[in-house]
């Protein structure tokens, strides 16, 4: 039987239900007032759900300490039939002792196939990855979503994390969020070298934003083409680091190995990327010709007209692309830059979804008109979102009127969002 506790629904409704009959249990306690006593009662109730196969439990922002984790873990450890587990434990006070209690749970859950574990903003250090070592017992695990962002993880912690992942031989989908920690060159490279051993991965999402990554942190992968032959979807977030053109060159070399990618998402916002870096990146991405979804975010870098031109070459090369999301805000594209990477879109015959964020680029009235002319040729697009705010464009002026008229001629358009606010 399925049971779902909705928003402010009393937790007692769960306590009074037929606990042994639950197979699918959804407990979102985000809006609940939870103290240690309620954690104790919740744990007692969960321990009676012996037939449970799927559990979603959201306890974020509840100030759970090691005592609370002791109660909770003692209940979870008895749920031997679980195949899917989502534990949202972010923004707590979980320390090394709490992690030890939680680790004991995964030594017993042999049937787990899918695990989402959020430990965002706790007190986790490099000594606390025993939890992933415990996951070695979960050999049926296919999907892992692990969030340890906003903790105190350094290079040693990243290395330990990577080493633990190598034991999960059946992983096909991995989402790893280690953003806002203290991971530098060695940690990132050790983590990358370990991921290379996860040869069955089909979907990989890695968030390393807000760390100490520089140009040397583009992974220690030596045989990526062979190791990631099955990879179809790749998402990398290196925003708010210290990456320049040299780092982008290393990233390009890595990406050139993934010739079978269908989905590529890159976030490099707030780094030190310039026109040379973009040219190098585009050159290496020419080997990736199977991409249907492409998302690139390069806001607050040092990109000019040449970057826009090179990105247009990349777009032109992706003949199978159906979705494009491009964020180039806070750069120096100017009116010509805004036009150049749009003018090639008419060659992307399969493109149906287009999102362009171009705010703060000195595009001006001329750029807006040129943009409209280019878009009017993209008759196949059904969803369009364009942000041209803060570009010296009069939102009640001629340029905006022309742009709107041009877009209205896109006959297949279903949804459109145009933003001009200055």
Which positions does each model-derived feature cover?
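C-terminal capping region of solenoid repeat domains
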Residues: 224, 230-231, 235, 241, ...
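N-terminal adaptor-interaction module of cullin-RING ubiquitin ligase components
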Residues: 1-63, 67-71, 83-91, 113-118, ...
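N-terminal cationic leader/targeting segments used for protein routing and processing
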Residues: 8-9, 36, 63, 81-82, ...
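Ser/Thr/Pro-rich low-complexity tandem-repeat tracts
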Residues: 43-44, 73-74, 84, 103-104, ...
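Intrinsically disordered, low-complexity linker/propeptide segments enriched in Ser/Thr/Gly/Pro
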Residues: 8, 13, 22-39, 69, ...
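Leucine-rich repeat
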Residues: 6-16, 18-24, 35-45, 47-54, 65-75, 77-84, 95-114, ...
């Amino acid at each position: 039987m399925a049971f779902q506790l909705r928003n402010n629904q009393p937790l007692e409704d769960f306590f009074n239900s037929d606990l042994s009959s639950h197979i699918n249990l959804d407990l979102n306690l985000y809006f609940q007032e939870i103290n240690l006593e309620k954690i104790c009662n919740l744990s007692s109730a969960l321990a009676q759900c012996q037939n449970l196969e799927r559990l979603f439990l959201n306890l974020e922002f509840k100030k759970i300490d090691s005592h609370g984790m002791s109660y909770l873990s003692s209940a979870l450890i008895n749920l031997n039939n679980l195949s899917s587990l989502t534990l949202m434990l972010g923004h707590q006070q979980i320390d090394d002792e709490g992690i030890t209690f939680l680790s004991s749970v995964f030594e017993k859950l042999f049937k787990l196939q899918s695990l989402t574990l959020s430990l965002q903003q706790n007190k986790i250090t490099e000594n606390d990855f025993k939890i992933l070592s415990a996951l070695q017992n979960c050999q049926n695990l296919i999907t892992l979503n692990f969030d340890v962002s906003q903790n105190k993880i350094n290079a040693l912690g990243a290395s330990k994390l990577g080493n633990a992942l190598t034991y999960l031989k059946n992983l096909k989908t991995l989402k790893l969020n280690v953003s806002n920690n203290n991971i530098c060159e060695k940690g990132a490279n050790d983590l990358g070298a370990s991921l290379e051993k996860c040869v069955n991965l089909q979907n990989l999402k890695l968030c390393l934003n807000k760390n100490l990554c520089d140009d040397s942190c583009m992974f220690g992968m030596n045989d990526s083409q062979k190791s990631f032959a099955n990879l179809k979807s790749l998402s990398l977030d290196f925003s708010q680091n210290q990456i320049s053109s040299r780092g982008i060159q290393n990233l390009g070399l890595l990406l050139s190995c993934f010739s079978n990618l269908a989905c590529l998402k890159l976030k490099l916002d707030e780094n030190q990327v310039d026109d040379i870096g973009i040219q190098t990146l585009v050159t290496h991405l020419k080997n990736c010709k199977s991409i249907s979804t492409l998302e690139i975010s390069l806001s607050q870098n040092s990109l000019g007209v040449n970057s826009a031109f090179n990105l247009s070459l990349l777009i032109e090369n992706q003949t199978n692309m159906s979705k494009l999301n491009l964020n180039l805000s806070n750069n120096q594209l100017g009116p010509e830059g805004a036009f150049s990477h749009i003018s090639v879109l008419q060659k992307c015959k399969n493109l149906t979804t287009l999102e362009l964020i171009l705010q703060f680029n000195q595009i001006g009235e001329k750029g807006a008109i040129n943009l409209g002319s280019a878009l009017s040729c993209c008759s196949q697009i059904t969803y369009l979102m364009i942000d041209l705010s803060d570009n010296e464009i009069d939102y009640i002026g001629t340029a905006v009127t022309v742009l709107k008229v041009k877009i209205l001629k896109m006959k297949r358009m279903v949804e459109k969002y145009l933003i001009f606010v200055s």
